[in-house]
Amino acid sequence: MVNNDKHDPLMLARQLPLKSVALILAGGRGTRLKGLTALRAKPAVHFGGKFRIIDFALSNCLNSGIRRIGVITQYQSHTLVQHIQRGWSFLNAEMNEFVDLLPAQQRNATDHWYRGTADAVCQNLDIIRRYRAEYVVILAGDHIYKMDYSRMLIDHVEKGAECTVACLPVPLEEASAFGVMSVDKQHRILDFAEKPDNPTPMPDNPDMALASMGIYVFNADYLYQLLDADHNTPDSNHDFGQDLIPKIVSQRLAWAHPFTLSCVTSGEDENQYWRDVGTLEAYWRANLDLASVTPELDVYDRHWPIRSAIESLPPAKFVQDRSGSHGMTMNSLVSGGCIVSGSVVTHSVLFPRVRVNSFCSIDSTVILPDVNVGRSCRLRRCVIDRACNLPEGMVIGENAEEDSRRFYRSEEGIVLVTRSMLEKL
């Protein structure tokens, strides 16, 4: 009898994740998020009422069956390390399951920080080789999406690829922020350019370009050879998008994996949700997406749960103040430990332990944990950073000139408020 197990998709979906290790690149500064990343790495930024951004990549790994994970850290890593220790320490080491933290560190062979994404992996090769994985999945730790990496691994193996790059169409006018590729009918990558000034449009859709998601699958031995060679190339930027992927494409060894094949959706919903929340506007908008009646990203999906650190908090409370005004919310996410007293909260996201005192009006605003909103405040189109104490009567989002003088105001009119900004008033 012929054994076809090695070609059975269900068998491959179980086996390939067990033969893989995921490396999450989580050392980025995220400078476009301004004050939100002054004291924390971008992957550690709060998102969606109770999560951190990195929870999406970590949850995708777990749900895909990948339980050997390395998180490569560098910039302002304490908050990120603390979150992973508290929320992701439940894997069973006896079953060779782990989330390893791989910080930048002084080594005999190097005297510098990570110089690029490829160098970040290269500097940890001594550790990564000990994992004895057949496949290495490289992930960005700062995107919001749900994806089954096992489907990408199957695609990689069935094509006999050395490297597979996840991709999706993006509007042509936005494509200069991504790696852009051209592919043939079999999805072999023919050309790749990192953040080109003039992105190549898709042949069948000239208003769109095919962009890299920053998600790669490599045959492990091939990756190690590439990294060793790149390490010894003096003029390299030591970056996957700028150096390694173009080199692999020139050798015709790279294949594209359309996000449509591995995007996780709920029920009849076919929206392929992926967001780079690298700017304040994108971050604000993606948070408020979750507060809509039918959000494109379903975080309530029991079949693909997004995990995070769990806090023991009392339920959110909406109370009547002494004047008889009721605490009310509409189209909003309100987390545990919040108290809304005699105020109205509309289309907003309140993270844990937010206190909204009486007579406030809050609209289209994201409020991070431990914020106190004083009486009679009016907030509109804001992001309030953690542990801010807004004084009584503060108005934000109604006067552009005043907002720009006191806080950071984006071109689209989103206002960021941090503790350091409040201390200067």
Curated annotation (Swiss-Prot):
One of its GO terms (molecular function) is glucose-1-phosphate adenylyltransferase activity. Pathway: Glycan biosynthesis; glycogen biosynthesis. It catalyses: alpha-D-glucose 1-phosphate + ATP + H(+) = ADP-alpha-D-glucose + diphosphate. Involved in the biosynthesis of ADP-glucose, a building block required for the elongation reactions to produce glycogen. Catalyzes the reaction between ATP and alpha-D-glucose 1-phosphate (G1P) to produce pyrophosphate and ADP-Glc. Belongs to the bacterial/plant glucose-1-phosphate adenylyltransferase family. Homotetramer. This is Glucose-1-phosphate adenylyltransferase. It comes from Pectobacterium carotovorum subsp. carotovorum (strain PC1). The lineage of its organism: Bacteria, Pseudomonadati, Pseudomonadota, Gammaproteobacteria, Enterobacterales.
